[in-house]
A protein has these predicted regions:
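Binding-site signature for planar aromatic cofactors or substrates
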Residues: 1-218
Length: 218
């Protein structure tokens, strides 16, 4: 493989032009509020999907798995996303609810890591979010056998068309297999790019007395 595919290592000039002096966030005491602020800033600067996050799970053999999904809600209870419970991630979550999340905002040169446990959100909450989706997306949730093998795209489209016909002229309810999960955070870490790889890291750990924070070496 050609080395030209990999970006060259930054030089002195690159670092000098990219240093950030905005470290006011280091004084934050509430990681959820800090996360919300960072996400709000990223929504302005990212090309798209600033709420995209990596969700890491493990299967029955302890083999890790990771994929990118969209964060759909955030408050002091946790981070919420939705998916098909019959998918690989859904099956893995039913086996082990220990989850790790990762956010990376290239435009801000920031990352956030979250570790915690996932629990299924209440049906009324999942129903409300499902109803807010575009009709086509709701139909797709019924038509897709997520993570299962399929012969070709024609097969997929035929099933989608059949599902559209099935719901023609009627509302599209949430399928029983389409669920939401809330990741209750036990650890949240914030990372801000620094010159010469000397980054700033701030970690929050949940204890019986609430959040405890501390700095980490880069």
């Amino acid at each position: 493989m050609s080395k030209s595919i990999i970006p060259s290592t930054p030089n002195e000039k690159d670092y000098a032009s990219s240093q950030s002096s905005d470290l006011g966030w280091i004084d934050s005491k509430d990681p959820v509020s800090l996360f919300s602020n960072w996400l709000s800033e990223a929504i302005v600067t990212e090309i798209n999907d600033a709420n995209a996050m990596s969700v890491a799970t493990v299967d029955k053999n302890g083999m890790p798995d990771v994929r990118v999904v969209l964060l759909k809600d955030i408050d002091h209870r946790g981070f919420v996303f939705y998916s098909n419970s019959e998918s690989n991630k859904g099956q893995q979550l039913s086996f082990s609810n220990k989850v790790a999340l990762g956010f990376h905002w290239k435009s801000k040169k920031r990352q956030v890591r979250v570790r915690g446990t996932a629990e299924v959100v209440a049906s009324i909450e999942a129903d409300a979010y499902f109803a807010s989706r575009a009709r086509g997306s709701r139909i797709s949730a019924w038509a897709s056998h997520q993570s299962r093998p399929v012969k070709d795209r024609e097969t997929m489209m035929n099933e989608l068309n059949e599902t559209e016909a099935r719901f023609e002229g009627t509302s599209v309810p949430r399928p029983n297999h389409w669920l939401g999960w809330r990741v209750k955070p036990e650890y949240i870490e914030f990372w801000q790019d620094g010159a010469y790889r000397f980054h700033d890291r701030l970690a929050f750990s949940m204890t019986s007395d609430g959040w405890v924070k501390g700095r980490l070496y880069p």
